């Protein structure tokens, strides 16, 4: 990461009975690049036959009884001789390194772009001051992921040479009720969450807390809860070729 930054903004309104808050974050990739791609592409440009020459020299030396260390040293030396040799007074290696670093990944370079944003709003309201028999709360949230990497990380390619931002929306809402019975406190809640790329999820929870002792200093708790996790944005929309294969997001839209 080089000159990479993330900026956060937040606004909040609250009192003892409710809160509403909103925040956003935005990413600036600066001059960041993929180091693996930088090394590989620079080597391929300066020594296109390096791997073949190295492998061709290594195996025969091992088969003739040389140690792996000696064979590796000799093979690396042979491959280095096969590399493009810069002329006197030139900076071929530095120039090639700079060109690859400034080019975009998946288009002959190692640089990547991340100009993504996140928008999130949430609220909660407690009806405790209006209802006597129990404490009831309701709340919810909305979130938007606004992704853009110009095709260097996410699969924004529209198939016609253009790259468009990817937007993912999700929302959720919940209600919770709590009731005290002398030494016992019972709480139950239910929540619904929906991401546009996945089925909605219902997650109920319940708990009982019993306070024992003269001063109620001993608490015993029993609870039941459920949860889930949707894949993150990269797991949904990544498209990332590597030397071992292609990392591909799992959503249908990808």
Region locations from a protein language model:
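Face-selective signature of the C-terminal outer-membrane beta-barrel domain
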Residues: 10-157, 163-198
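Flexible, active-site-adjacent loop/turn segments at secondary-structure boundaries
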Residues: 2, 146, 169, 226, ...
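Surface-exposed extracellular loop regions of Gram-negative outer-membrane beta-barrel proteins
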Residues: 30-35, 196-201, 210-254
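A structural signal for beta-strand register positions
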Residues: 23, 205-207
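One-face residue pattern on beta-strands with alternating periodicity enriched for small/polar residues
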Residues: 174, 203-205
């Amino acid at each position: 990461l080089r000159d990479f930054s993330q900026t956060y903004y937040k606004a909040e309104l609250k009192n003892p009975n409710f809160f509403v808050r909103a925040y956003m974050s935005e990413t600036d990739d600066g001059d960041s690049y993929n180091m693996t791609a930088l090394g590989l592409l620079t080597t391929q440009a300066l020594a296109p036959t390096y791997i073949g020459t190295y492998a061709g020299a290594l195996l025969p030396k091992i088969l003739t009884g040389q140690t792996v260390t000696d064979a590796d040293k000799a093979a690396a030396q042979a491959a280095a001789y096969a590399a493009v040799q810069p002329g006197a007074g030139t900076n071929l290696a530095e120039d090639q390194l700079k060109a690859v670093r400034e080019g975009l990944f998946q288009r002959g370079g190692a640089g990547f772009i991340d100009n993504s944003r996140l928008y999130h709003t949430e609220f909660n309201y407690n009806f405790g001051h209006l209802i006597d028999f129990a404490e009831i709360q309701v709340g919810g949230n909305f979130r938007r992921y606004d992704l853009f990497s110009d095709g260097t990380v996410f699969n924004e390619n529209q198939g016609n040479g253009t790259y468009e931002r990817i937007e993912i929306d999700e929302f959720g809402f919940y209600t919770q009720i709590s009731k005290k019975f002398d030494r016992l406190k019972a709480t139950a809640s239910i929540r619904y969450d929906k991401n546009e790329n996945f089925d909605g999820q219902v997650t109920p929870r319940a708990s009982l807390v019993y306070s024992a002792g003269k001063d109620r200093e001993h608490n015993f708790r029993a609870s039941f809860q459920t949860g889930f996790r949707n894949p993150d944005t990269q797991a949904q929309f990544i498209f990332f070729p590597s030397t071992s294969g292609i990392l591909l997001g799992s959503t249908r839209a990808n």
